């Protein structure tokens, strides 16, 4: 298998399918457009979060686009159980980012086999792909070197108060995604975590309320499992939005300069 970039757990959870009308204009259905976008994912060695349902996901990548056979070749998970879940799922929802643009597409009819003598997953080419860049959906993948964190005030499995220091993996105008060890706390979709503390590099932590929007267990490429928690900003203090946008802007500018060789 070709060398891949470092896995990023920042890929967001799938967008709500109930927002179809709102997302329709961002959906690609042309065969040429879909083939080109898949090829771009190969060229940029983009890591994909593949959601199998039931809150489970694993990291994968597009290895090849077989236009003649009308199929896409994916890298399997090192975890056999994750592969079994994927093969049994009626639908695989793939989510990634490419040059700051969110990409999401469904795969059905997943199968397994060999590609050039190595294990691989196969699926028919997707019928559509979502290509989205909008302020409310955009998420900055936080560089590992920044060590952005958020102190979550939640409850453990015994319903006792617990504080969990979570690593922030992506951040946007509307919320953050964090990763925590599985079993660190009891999170409920729709529940509110009050008085959490988001630490940004430019000052004191921001105290804010967070609403749990999605939960996904992720199997990393080394086989370990962690819980990804998607959180919406339920109540931001005054000027906090400006600080968050400033952090995103400065980080994007630094990353772009580095990519151009300016740093």
Curated annotation (Swiss-Prot):
GO BP of this protein: bacterial-type flagellum-dependent cell motility; regulation of bacterial-type flagellum-dependent cell motility by regulation of motor speed
GO cellular component terms given for this protein: bacterial-type flagellum basal body
Principal location: other
This protein's record includes keyword Nucleotide-binding: yes
Residues covered by the PilZ domain: 133-250
One of the record's GO molecular function terms: cyclic-di-GMP binding
Gene3D superfamilies: Electron Transport, Fmn-binding Protein, Chain A, predicted glycosyltransferase like domains
Domain of life assignment: Bacteria
Region (Disordered), start-end ranges: 1-21
Compartment annotation: Bacterial flagellum basal body
Keyword list, A-Z: Bacterial flagellum, c-di-GMP, Nucleotide-binding
Family from the record: Belongs to the YcgR family.
Subunit: Monomer. Interacts with the flagellar basal bodies.
Name of the protein described by the UniProt record: Flagellar brake protein YcgR
Designated gene of the protein: ycgR
